[in-house]
């Protein structure tokens, strides 16, 4: 087969896979936004069939022959096509090892589990969710062997979200964070606490929605290409670099919750919108890893969004949206309130300093679940034990405990460490960015274009063209958590007068 003809077939293959992705994503988006509560069963059948057809296309003899042919001609291919072939071969080999019936059943289970999780959380009923959680754990234990039988099961799953990461590396990473941050948290615990009571007045959802629209405008998110919806758990869903959807949740007694979830999900969206046009409709079109993705979301949410210059820039507008609630509250008071460091129950509402402790709880539980030393029925007790040990807080119920996140209901075991890695990647990127861009001058003007421009040049445009570690190295050098620890130490030492 001529190389040119083979590349045309490669393009068609990837567009077909993209079409399956769009169909599946559309069904999921409908499920969590507008679908009636009793519609999960039929949707699960459809999503299972789509998964089966996608797997069949990916593992058929014609696809394998095409990838073999192009691999043999690798020296004739440009970088983009070589990387496409490498990634598709990896997926092909993985999916070939998974029995088709098992793969389809798992996809149907994920749809059912998400529906059950929503009901269990609303009713604060872990017993309702427990059986499907155990099924998901059992599937993921088996799938880990299909992914890479040479690795420990949890290492194989971690590698699906952040290639090159394993438990040994994460144990060292989290221990470094513990050593650097826990003494700081204890010192702050001895200081007078910041008043954030004004954040918890009544903030009508309609006004919060209008403010969310304003924040998207400040971020430079083009509403022709980025939609904003409302769901129980905020998320980002990408179709291509001209069609990204984000969601948030409006708590009428916590205005900071939706504010920072919009900035967080907006960071994810900017990453997807910034990927090069020539990578669209290929396997390289999405973000390279969840760690790098979370570096972008948490960059805008925290490094920029909770900075004094940015808060001062947007605060007059915020007061205009909430004149009664913020009357007499200064920008400095607001800045201090949204940076208040205090151990809490809810991960997505945690402050920057204690956030990684929330991730560590989930990491320890996932290690045990996938390692076979913990069963689903025991998760609430272990969750409560670790929250008391790590954060010093009592877990009053499962809705605010182990049912608070949607990740496990979607089968995403191994995702959570990406949040902590992303936070550390982001701090390192900020240090490097400050050498090239007047970051704080731009933030003080409410002009994020120079910041986004730097990230687009160094990170976004490449999509999956490079390995995650190479993306980080290209942007800011070899990875180290020290910049993250120093950033938090400087910020909270000043904030609390340590």
List PLM regions with ranges.
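Secondary-structure capping and boundary motifs in well-ordered enzyme cores
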Residues: 42, 102-105, 132, 204, ...
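A well-structured
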Residues: 1-163, 464-467, 482, 489-498
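Active-site recognition of the HExxH zinc-binding catalytic motif
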Residues: 10, 257-276, 294-298
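C-terminal, non-catalytic "cap/extension" segments appended to globular domains
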Residues: 2-6, 22-25, 38, 42, ...
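Contiguous, non-catalytic segments that form substrate-binding/exosite surfaces or channel walls
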Residues: 106-255
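Divalent metal-coordination and catalytic microenvironments
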Residues: 10, 148, 264, 297, ...
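Post-HExxH zinc-binding segment in Zn-dependent metallohydrolases
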Residues: 286-327
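All-alpha helical catalytic cores of prenyl diphosphate-utilizing isoprenoid enzymes
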Residues: 174, 178, 205-209, 215, ...
């Amino acid at each position: 087969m001529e190389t040119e003809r083979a590349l045309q077939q490669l393009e068609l293959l990837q567009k077909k896979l993209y079409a399956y992705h769009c169909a599946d994503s559309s069904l999921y988006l409908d499920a969590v936004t507008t679908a009636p509560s009793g519609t999960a069963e039929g949707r699960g059948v459809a999503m299972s069939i789509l998964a089966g057809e996608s797997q069949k296309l990916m593992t058929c003899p014609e696809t394998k022959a095409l990838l073999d042919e192009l691999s043999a001609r690798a020296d004739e291919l440009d970088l983009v096509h070589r990387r496409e072939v490498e990634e598709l071969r990896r997926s092909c080999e993985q999916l070939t090892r998974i029995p088709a019936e098992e793969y389809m059943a798992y996809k149907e289970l994920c749809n059912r589990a998400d529906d059950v999780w929503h009901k269990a959380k609303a009713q604060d009923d872990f017993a309702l969710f427990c059986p499907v959680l155990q099924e998901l754990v059992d599937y993921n234990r088996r799938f880990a062997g299909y992914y890479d039988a040479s690795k420990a099961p949890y290492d194989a799953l971690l590698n699906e979200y952040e290639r090159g990461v394993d438990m040994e590396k994460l144990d060292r990473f989290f221990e470094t964070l513990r050593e650097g941050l826990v003494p700081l948290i204890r010192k702050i615990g001895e200081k007078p606490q910041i008043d954030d009571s004004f954040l918890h007045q009544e903030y009508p959802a309609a006004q919060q929605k209008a403010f969310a629209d304003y924040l998207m405008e400040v971020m430079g998110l083009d509403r022709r290409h980025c939609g904003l919806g409302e769901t129980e758990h905020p998320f980002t869903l990408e179709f291509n670099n001209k069609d990204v959807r984000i969601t948030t949740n409006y708590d009428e007694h916590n205005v900071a919750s939706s504010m920072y979830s919009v900035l967080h999900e907006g960071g994810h969206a900017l990453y997807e919108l910034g990927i090069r046009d020539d990578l669209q409709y290929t396997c390289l079109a999405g973000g390279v890893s969840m760690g790098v993705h979370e570096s972008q979301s948490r960059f805008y949410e925290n490094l920029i969004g909770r900075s004094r210059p940015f808060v001062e820039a947007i605060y007059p507008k915020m007061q205009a949206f909430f004149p009664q609630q913020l009357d007499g509250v200064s920008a400095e008071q607001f800045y201090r309130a949204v940076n208040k460091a205090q151990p809490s129950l809810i991960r997505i509402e945690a402050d920057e300093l204690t956030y990684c402790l929330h991730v560590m709880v989930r990491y320890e539980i996932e290690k045990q679940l996938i390692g076979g030393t913990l069963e689903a029925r025991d998760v609430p007790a272990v969750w409560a034990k670790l929250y008391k040990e790590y954060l010093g807080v009592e877990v009053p119920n499962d809705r605010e405990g182990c049912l608070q996140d949607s990740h496990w209901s979607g089968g995403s075991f191994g995702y959570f460490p990406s949040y902590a890695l992303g936070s550390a990647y982001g701090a390192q990127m900020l240090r490097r960015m400050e050498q090239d861009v007047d970051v704080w001058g731009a933030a003080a003007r409410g002009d994020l274009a120079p910041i986004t421009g730097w990230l687009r040049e160094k990170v976004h445009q490449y999509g999956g063209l490079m390995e995650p570690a190479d993306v980080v190295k290209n942007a800011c050098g070899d990875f180290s958590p020290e910049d993250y620890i120093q950033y938090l130490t400087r910020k909270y030492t000043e904030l609390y007068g340590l």
